Amino acid sequence: MFVTSAFAEETAPAVTGGDTHSGTGVPAEAHGTFPPFDPATFPSQLLWLAITFGLFYLFLKKVAMPRIGGIIDVRNDRISQDLDQASKLKGEADAAVAAYEQELAEAKKNASSIGQQAADAAKAEAETARKKIEAALDEKLGEAEARISSIKANAMKEVGSIAEDTASAIVEALVGGKASKAEIAAAVKSVAR
């Protein structure tokens, strides 16, 4: 509020009837002890303290503590249910891990047996193919040896005639005359033996 100079000049009405405190306006003779500290009021204060404490105790006992106890019981029940569920889930997880490990071991065993079977099958196929190839090579080798022996036999047959022709040419060149075929054949046969 805005104070004007005219309002500020007004003076408070004077109190008639005795001395007053300057700040409170309370008469000086009313100056006594603070009522809660007055020994004359202790019995009533103690009575009200007991009544208030009793009511507060009854309130706590009948209202607050049952609610708090109920909340604690609910929490304990929830915790025990959670622990039971956790142990159940842990058991299920352990069972799942055991089943997984068993299936993994079986899969490894199956993979090993499948690998062994595949290796055995490949080895058998390779052995069969090797035997077929060896048989084919033996057959070709036999045919080649037969051809070589026939070529050799033919060559040996012709060697005699070639030797006779060569001997005839040598005799003609050295002696200057011709020898008979029968003489040359007899000479080649005697040397070939």
Swiss-Prot record:
Keywords: ATP synthesis, Cell inner membrane, Cell membrane, CF(0), Hydrogen ion transport, Ion transport, Membrane, Transmembrane, Transmembrane helix, Transport
Positions of transmembrane segments: 40-60
Phosphoprotein listed as a keyword: no
One Pfam assignment: ATP-synt_B
InterPro entries: ATP_synth_b/b'su_bac/chlpt, ATP_synthase_B_chain
An example Gene Ontology molecular-function term: proton-transporting ATP synthase activity, rotational mechanism
Protein localization: Cell inner membrane
Membrane topology: Single-pass membrane protein
Top-level taxonomic group: Bacteria
Stretch list, region Disordered: 13-32
GO annotations of cellular component type: plasma membrane; proton-transporting ATP synthase complex
Family per similarity comment: Belongs to the ATPase B chain family.
Assembly, per entry: F-type ATPases have 2 components, F(1) - the catalytic core - and F(0) - the membrane proton channel. F(1) has five subunits: alpha(3), beta(3), gamma(1), delta(1), epsilon(1). F(0) has three main subunits: a(1), b(2) and c(10-14). The alpha and beta chains form an alternating ring which encloses part of the gamma chain. F(1) is attached to F(0) by a central stalk formed by the gamma and epsilon chains, while a peripheral stalk is formed by the delta and b chains.
NCBIfam families attached to this UniProt entry: PRK09174.1
Protein function: F(1)F(0) ATP synthase produces ATP from ADP in the presence of a proton or sodium gradient. F-type ATPases consist of two structural domains, F(1) containing the extramembraneous catalytic core and F(0) containing the membrane proton channel, linked together by a central stalk and a peripheral stalk. During catalysis, ATP synthesis in the catalytic domain of F(1) is coupled via a rotary mechanism of the central stalk subunits to proton translocation. Component of the F(0) channel, it forms part of the peripheral stalk, linking F(1) to F(0).
Name by which UniProt lists this protein: ATP synthase subunit b 1
Species for this entry: Mesorhizobium japonicum (strain LMG 29417 / CECT 9101 / MAFF 303099)
